[in-house]
């Protein structure tokens, strides 16, 4: 490897191996499983990720003829096969999307039901929502939440079954208006707190040191024109905007659309005015990549 370049040489085929991951990375685990499924011999992956999406992938691959054992555990065994065949498989519900809407309901003191969802996949999130004051009711493949006065709670992201890093930013938006002082610790990714400055622009009181955010809850946030820098921070800004009594415009929805389908239409069911608008107005915010504009229309969300 030379700086940002990777030099590789193609081999005629892959062979099984014993691999131990330094950290239980979801992407690395998925990639290794898919490669090992068609490799010659046995592959053993230790310290593998245990996220539900890993288990779902393994179930589909096994339907296609793969031989994968113990998915969902820290040690996964794969016996390579010569070929795979087609199958029909229903992907599990998106737990991160479901969690985002539950957090949005808590932030706006709303009552909603999210379905279909697998409640066990969100146990860590549901526990924190209950701890922060919301009432949670689980019935089969649905979760109902009734938002209440928000209390400050501490969270620390962790691999599954811990609190998911993908819901750290939305939950921080919730904690900005909680009563009391909370602490959010990010242990999975570096530089995943770029939403802190944006939330502070809206009136929150967050102090960031390394990977730990200390939050003093405020009574309300103010509406702003802001630009989401990535998928989860965009969702967090919109949740924060929903709690404001004034109008907010959130841009950079090309990030949001990667992970959420019809996001604003679904959020409108919370009883809040939110809609997608088209504007040719230039954005002056320094954190926006102006190369994306190219004199094209820019999409934003209006929440009030």
Question: Which residue ranges define each predicted feature?
Answer:
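Structural preference for solvent-exposed beta-strand-turn elements
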Residues: 1-304
């Amino acid at each position: 490897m030379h700086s940002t370049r990777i030099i590789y040489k193609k081999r005629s085929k892959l062979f099984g191996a014993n691999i131990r991951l330094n950290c239980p990375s979801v992407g690395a685990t998925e990639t290794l499983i898919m490669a090992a499924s068609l490799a010659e011999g046995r592959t053993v992956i230790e310290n593998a990720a245990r996220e539900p999406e890993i288990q779902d992938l393994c179930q589909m691959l096994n339907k296609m003829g793969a031989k994968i054992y113990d998915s969902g555990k820290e040690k996964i065994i794969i016996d390579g096969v010569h070929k795979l065949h087609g199958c029909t498989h229903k992907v599990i519900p998106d737990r991160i999307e479901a969690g985002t809407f539950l957090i949005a309901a808590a932030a706006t003191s709303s009552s909603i039901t999210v379905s279909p969802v697998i409640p066990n996949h969100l146990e860590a999130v549901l526990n924190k929502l209950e701890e922060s004051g919301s009432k949670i009711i689980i019935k089969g493949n649905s979760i109902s939440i009734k938002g209440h006065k928000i209390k400050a709670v501490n969270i620390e992201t962790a691999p599954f079954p811990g609190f998911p890093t993908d819901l750290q930013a939305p939950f921080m938006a919730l904690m900005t208006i909680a009563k009391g002082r909370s602490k959010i610790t990010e242990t999975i990714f570096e530089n995943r707190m770029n939403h802190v400055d944006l939330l502070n622009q809206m009136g929150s009181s967050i102090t960031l040191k390394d990977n730990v955010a200390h939050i003093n809850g405020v009574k309300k946030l103010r509406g702003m024109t802001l630009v989401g820098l990535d998928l989860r921070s965009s969702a967090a800004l919109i949740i924060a905007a929903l709690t404001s009594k004034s109008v907010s415009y959130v841009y950079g929805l090309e990030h949001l659309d990667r992970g959420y389908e019809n996001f604003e239409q679904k959020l409108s069911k919370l009883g809040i005015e939110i809609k997608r608008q088209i504007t040719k107005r230039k954005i002056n915010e320094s954190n926006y990549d102006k190369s994306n504009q190219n004199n094209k229309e820019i999409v934003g969300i209006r929440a009030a």
